[in-house]
Amino acid sequence: MLKLVKMFSDGSCLGNPGSGGYGTILRYKLHEKILTSGFFLTTNNRMELMGVICGLESLKESCIVEITIDSQYVKQGITNWIATWEKKKWKTTKKKLIKNLDLWLRINAVIKNHHITWFWVKAHMGHLENERCDKIARQSAQSPSVKDFFYENNFYQNKNL
């Protein structure tokens, strides 16, 4: 029988682009784990994606995962756009690579290991876990320690993709 894990995640960026961070809470029964990291130069959407990716990648076995986020970009991307992107070899209608391709490839790989239900909440409306994740993400953005290699090195303009 698969374990039920509840995940809450949020991303933050001080300036966009700017220093950023994510905060993710994983909850299994009475156990809770907090994941966070701060990046020197990134975007808000990348941090929203990173929070979910790192949460899912930290799970050691297949689980039923209920993910609560405030990012329409992530929710729409994963529930509506990703199948089309994959069919079109990750290109937009203008034949350009989608933004944040490195992260969409990671999330696309990791979601296949789990049974996921996605929940969206409006940001800054008092949802307890979303507010906690927002605070954690902002704190990490204020003290970055990691380089967002793909973003900082213009990964998307590299012809050797």
From Swiss-Prot:
One of its GO terms (biological process) is DNA replication, removal of RNA primer. Binds 1 Mg(2+) ion per subunit. May bind a second metal ion at a regulatory site, or after substrate binding. Its main location: cytoplasm. One of its GO terms (molecular function) is magnesium ion binding. SUPFAM superfamilies: Ribonuclease H-like. Mg(2+) 2 binds at residues 10, 134. InterPro entries: RNase_H, RNaseH-like_sf, RNaseH_domain, RNaseH_sf, RNaseHI. It catalyses: Endonucleolytic cleavage to 5'-phosphomonoester. Pfam families: RNase_H. Its cofactor is Mg(2+). Its EC number is 3.1.26.4. It is an enzyme of class 3 (hydrolase). Mg(2+) 1 binds at residues 10, 48, 70. PROSITE patterns: RNASE_H_1. GO terms for cellular component: cytoplasm. It is found in: Cytoplasm. The keyword Hydrolase applies. Keywords: Cytoplasm, Endonuclease, Hydrolase, Magnesium, Metal-binding, Nuclease. Transmembrane segments: none annotated. The keyword Ligase does not apply. Monomer. HAMAP family: RNase_H. Belongs to the RNase H family. Endonuclease that specifically degrades the RNA of RNA-DNA hybrids. This is Ribonuclease H. It comes from Buchnera aphidicola subsp. Schizaphis graminum (strain Sg). The gene is rnhA.
